Amino acid sequence: MERALRRMEKKRRNNPVNKKQIIISLMICLAVALFAAVFIHIEQTKQRSMQITAGNTHNVGNSYRNIVYKGQEYQYNNRITNILYAGVDSTGKLEASSQYGNKARADSIALVVMDEKNRKMTILSINRDTMTDIRRYTMNGNDKGLYTTHIGYAYSYGDGGKVSCESLCEAVSLLLGDIPVKRYVVTNQDSMPYINELAGGITLTVPNNDLQEKYPEMAEGAQVTLDDSSIKDFLQYRDTEESFSNEGRMQRQKAYLTAYVEKMQSMDENDLEKAWDSLEVMDDYIQTSVTRNQYLGLVKSLKKAEFTEDSIEQLPGTDQEGDLHDEFHVDEEALQELIIRLFYEKV
């Protein structure tokens, strides 16, 4: 009996079929593990891609390059650089979070259009209450598609970082016929004294009486120099009890922008270069995709560009009272003519 058992054991050890089965089983296990790893990686990559940027979701393609309007063909001026500026209604450090939504709202929005071919700069002021398509996300960053609401919320629905910035860029691009808007500068309320100081303080003419009760010296038509104590109110204050009070704030922002650009044009290039280096002190309050080299190139263009108060344009349209908030509705025909005038040339 014992001898028989030993023969069976020897036969089992030398049986190639058993070895083959073991090898096959191991290969199957490895294949399953590999498949699972690949599947998990793909799902994670898909998830991340949905969370990275609105710019990845919205591809402008080439459709904007050539358009036809009222029978006339137009070609996009490829020597234009577009930079979006937005001031958001928050204080403290600007930083992204893993949870999307409920972020700051873009209170002031402007597109800087630098036309190197015609040596001019235009600033297109965009009402924050403009009703247009913006991108929404779930709380964990999944893309929910486009939704029509106030353009200022394009930043709010993102992550408070790059996604928010690029969502706002996308909203402006969609509003303006898919023109490319890739560069941006976003600041919050705590940045204002630093921005003012970069230009050595700004002196301007007050355009309205909105602030006269708090600042008697700020009567319409008065010349004032803004300092740390007044800059935030001048650029941000509005009477929330009054309908369309954002219009008065936009008038003050326009006056400030005009004076600021004129001051920068009067500075020499060395001082403007130092201004970039000084931005380090406001790192916590600024988000930008503009590199140092791009900034220096823009500075040179700025020095040569034609710029007056008339170089600041406002989005054409009308104010309306909405169910919850004021709304600004664009005049589509006037907007199309503005787009052609700013960005296109006849073929």
What are these regions (language model features)?
Residues 2-28, 35-347:
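Non-catalytic, solvent-exposed segments at the cell envelope interface
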